[in-house]
């Protein structure tokens, strides 16, 4: 189980944008099923409200799911194969997932779920983990009625430094700080009230996340 909140504050160097904030509030619920010593199944359901939060309604709601099989080759190597789905405002977003998990040493781990995420993580204490993450994401935000309920499509590539601190084997405090070297926007289904150029010329900005989540880590469960 987990929850997250993201807020994108838009800033234009030349003038003020018509849309100044895009926000997303999400709840994740997932589980891990061990089939045998070598195979496991992971599932995750994500429910999200994603919009400018001007006039909230059921039109701002999205639902998604992730599922994959994990094969453990040995105590240091795992591979994953699965599928990602999210109901975006332009329609369903579906693509395959190829994952890996390499234990490089007692404290160093390299893992990812391609094409969306790659992590390099170092265990700094019994409960603390420090890492570097690469994210690629395409998502959408519903606009208010004054913009004809159009939506903004965002594509971004992010680099993040993060820290996780486990209060116990499942509950963790997390924080992240990073930068998006690539961020692009497109606007769809509007009536001309919001010119496209108002979103494509924004300066890339620093970002930060913090929160509390319930996570199941196989390496902690095995200890």
Question: For the regions a protein language model found, what residue spans apply to each?
Answer:
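Outer-membrane beta-barrel translocator/channel fold
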Residues: 4-21, 114-208
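Hydrophobic, lipid-facing positions within transmembrane beta-strands of outer-membrane proteins
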Residues: 23-29, 45-49, 61-67, 94-98, ...
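Residue-level signature of outer-membrane beta-barrel architecture
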Residues: 33, 71, 102, 112, ...
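Repeated loop/turn-to-beta-strand initiation elements of outer-membrane beta-barrel proteins
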Residues: 37-43, 76-81, 107-110, 127-130, ...
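Outer-membrane beta-barrel "beta-signal"
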Residues: 97-103, 163, 202-223
């Amino acid at each position: 189980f987990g929850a997250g909140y993201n807020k994108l504050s838009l800033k234009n160097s030349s003038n003020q944008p018509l849309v100044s904030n895009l926000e997303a509030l999400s709840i994740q619920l997932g589980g891990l099923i061990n089939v045998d010593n070598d195979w496991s199944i992971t599932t995750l359901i994500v429910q999200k409200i994603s919009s400018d939060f001007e006039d909230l309604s059921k039109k701002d709601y999205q639902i998604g799911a992730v599922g994959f099989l994990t094969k453990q080759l040995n105590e240091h190597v795992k591979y994953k194969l699965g599928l990602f789905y999210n109901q975006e405002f332009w329609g369903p977003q579906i693509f395959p997932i190829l994952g890996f998990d390499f234990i490089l040493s007692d404290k160093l781990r390299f893992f990812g779920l391609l094409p969306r995420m790659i992590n390099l993580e170092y265990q700094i204490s019994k409960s603390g983990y420090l890492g570097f993450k690469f994210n690629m994401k395409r998502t959408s935000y519903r606009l208010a009625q004054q913009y004809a309920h159009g939506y903004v499509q965002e594509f971004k590539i992010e680099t993040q430094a993060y820290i996780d601190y486990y209060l116990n084997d499942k509950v963790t405090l997390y924080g992240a700080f990073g930068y998006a070297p690539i961020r692009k926007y497109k606007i769809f289904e509007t009536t001309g009230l919001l010119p496209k150029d108002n979103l494509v010329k924004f300066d890339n900005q620093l970002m930060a996340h913090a929160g509390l989540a319930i996570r199941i880590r196989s390496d902690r469960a095995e200890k």
